[in-house]
């Protein structure tokens, strides 16, 4: 039975009710996970499940399809990874039985590494295939055998065309950040891939939003899903400070350079709306001798990996990024997020600022707002349910904290003769 809109609404109500279990289920043992998985979680320093894990793992262990909404850093990977690992441990077959689709190379790599850590005390093998790196090493990994395959749609389609990968034995399918996959134009590839996966399977579907297009795909591929949705997903943590600065568009770089004179900003990701703006900002910061690098879709995989690793090591003070390129990036000690450009949709704002103030640490989110971006900020504030703090722009200390209104020039009509 396929999911219908009414079914999804019913599941939302059930999920809200089920959230009460998070105060009852306080250990991974109570979730029904086997000792090898509990040992791996302990090795990773995880002593109690997150809310998304409390909601998703029990129905997943029962074989139910799961439709979920959860942010980066919520424990989402373990929410689908642990049930998959337990099932593979119970009935090992030596074939690729689980497929995880992710929109970007960075996210696919991050998921694969996390699953490998969770599988540490098992015989389950994990492989990742994605574009931007050599085809041969990934082909060799597939030949060695993998119980779980993590892939981006484009590279997986390449392997399927060359018949170097098969999906005949897939029992568990995961679509992570499905909304982003569709935004990036992967829907045709995703449909072709799913068509090669057996209809009799368990499906996990995670998406930050449920647009008409996403809802249509949900109805096609999910069967009687349990919906798990955290109402707190749009509420930044209390340790996060959020400040707006009113600034003309042409003065944004000057403002950022001025703010960087504060040595407390030692590690920051600056988000731009486009790749071209990311390039210009990085070049401008270099001229001011700010240690900076950037990641976006036009950078090679090796360039992106190098930039991220050196940023984590502290060799770069600022990492300039676009939203799509930054999805899947996990930096545990990020002090600041700077919205150089206000995102076009509120969901991207929460994705951005959610990268700082993690694990009870404090963090700062700074947003530059030009007059034409004020409607976007109002949308974000409406979603938040509160007005964000306005800071004094150090470039114009005596000016208003509100963005200047666009100047309207009225021209007198020529007199009729």
Predicted segments, located by residue:
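Conserved helicase RecA-like core
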Residues: 2-8, 14-401
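Dual-mode signal for accessory low-complexity, basic/Gly-rich regions
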Residues: 398-417
